[in-house]
Design a protein with these regions (language model features):
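Glycine/threonine-rich flexible loop motifs
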Residues: 177-183, 219-226
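Glycine-rich phosphate/pyrophosphate-binding loop and the adjoining helix
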Residues: 2-106, 129, 280-283, 287-366
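Short catalytic helix/loop segments, enriched in acidic residues and glycine
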Residues: 126-140
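An anion/phosphate-binding loop that grips the pyrophosphate of nucleotide cofactors and donors
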Residues: 206-207
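Short glycine-rich His-centered loop
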Residues: 106-125
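Short mixed-charge
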Residues: 236-265
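Charged, often glycine-rich, active-site loop that binds/positions anionic groups
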Residues: 153-183
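A short, gly/pro- and small-residue-rich
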Residues: 223-238
Length: 366
């Protein structure tokens, strides 16, 4: 507990931003704009009724229309929790049990961070995907390993795949950020088909995570950054939304000020990071990814698990895949990064991996 707080009043949430609420006409215009295909032309009366139903849900702010009582294990068993969140919560719990069960194979999560694929506008696969395939060959050849591939290019090429932006609840108060995230789906705002409830269990079940990404304007790709931001709930997030009565900012501030333990839900997992660029930024992106993972108390598998390189430095984009074909050194470096992660994961599971200081208590949680 902060000495000055001592159970007193929490600061009131600061407000003053303009309202984003729409009137009925504008809401229905935006809602109807998604039905442009001629197949919908004979269905205008039906669409009118559907648009009116959607407007009613929006007007009444029905974020989570289907709920049930939280039940045993929560601070307030009678609180109505969204059934979507309960399902996500159970999936995360199940993933943690798989992670902790030493009789299960070791699990690797291999992430392709590029949004490019031949299945949509770019017309060509990404180099990140090819590098991920090289890494996958290493994992697939090892005994006692299962690999889950998370291809973030699906955000740009697959129907119904979305990752919505983090709403930054953590910046209001740590306890307001729920684990897993409870901000989505928001049915009244049409914020549905969010992928993160499938992604959280992949991270939780993994003993090792390997991220392969290009540099996009001195940063990670936008799909990868969306996932990174939405993983904030894994680093200090509140696993019991009933303690904050849902999204009650004042209640969350009181909880944090009374003393928050910042649970590290992904701590102890090992990671590897491979970043490739064409001109500039690879080192900074690699460093920012590694720093982020370290801050969440994940541990680098070893020096060769972190790699930043340029492919076709200052060469035409049109021939970048040819440059990768010719660069057998980076191909082997990616294999070595995967081998390092694999070796680290197996050593950690057998109790032989030493991460000095891992069990120390930090005087600063934030």
């Amino acid at each position: 507990m902060f000495d000055w707080f001592k159970g007193g009043k929490a600061p009131q949430p600061r407000k003053g931003m303009p309202s984003p609420r729409l009137d009925e006409a504008e809401f229905k215009r935006r809602f109807r704009s998604q039905f442009q295909d001629q197949a919908f032309d004979p269905l205008q009366e039906e669409l009118d009724r559907i648009a009116h139903a959607a407007w009613t849900a929006y007007e009444q702010s029905r974020k989570s229309p289907r709920t049930r009582k939280a039940g045993p294990g929560f601070a307030d068993p009678n609180y109505d929790l969204a059934v979507d969140w309960i399902a996500a919560h159970e999936a995360v719990k199940s993933a943690q049990q798989r992670h902790d069960d030493s009789s299960n194979p070791a699990s690797i999560l291999l992430i392709n961070g590029s949004s490019r694929s031949e299945h949509t506008c770019p017309g060509e696969m990404s180099k990140s995907f090819r590098l991920a395939e090289i890494a996958h060959e290493v994992f697939a050849s090892a005994e006692g390993i299962e690999t889950n591939i998370l291809d973030l290019s699906r955000l740009a090429s697959e129907y119904g795949r979305k990752i919505y932006p983090c709403k930054a609840c953590f910046s209001t108060a740590a306890a307001l950020c729920h684990w897993p995230c409870s901000c989505y789906p928001n049915y009244s705002l049409g914020q549905t088909q969010d992928w993160m409830n499938d992604i959280y269990p992949l991270w939780v079940a993994a003993h090792g995570i390997m991220i392969i990404t290009p540099v996009n304007w001195y940063h990670t790709s936008s799909p990868l950054k969306l996932m990174i931001d939405r993983l904030v709930c894994a680093d200090g997030g509140n696993p019991d939304p009933t303690r904050t009565h849902g999204k009650d900012a004042v209640a969350a501030k009181k909880l944090e000020l009374a003393g928050w333990d910042y649970p590290r839900h992904l701590a102890g997992r090992l990671f590897s990071v491979v970043v490739h660029g064409d001109v500039e930024g690879a080192e900074n992106v690699r460093r920012s990814l590694s720093d982020w993972l370290r801050f969440m108390r994940l541990c680098p598998a070893g020096p060769t698990a972190e790699l930043d390189r340029y492919i076709g430095y200052w060469k035409p984009y049109a021939t970048s895949h040819d440059e990768l074909d010719a660069d057998t050194a980076i191909q082997e470096e990616v294999r070595n990064a995967a081998r390092t992660l694999l070796e680290g994961v197996m050593a950690k599971r057998s109790g032989q991996f030493v991460a000095a200081g891992e069990e120390l208590s930090s005087p600063r949680q934030k």
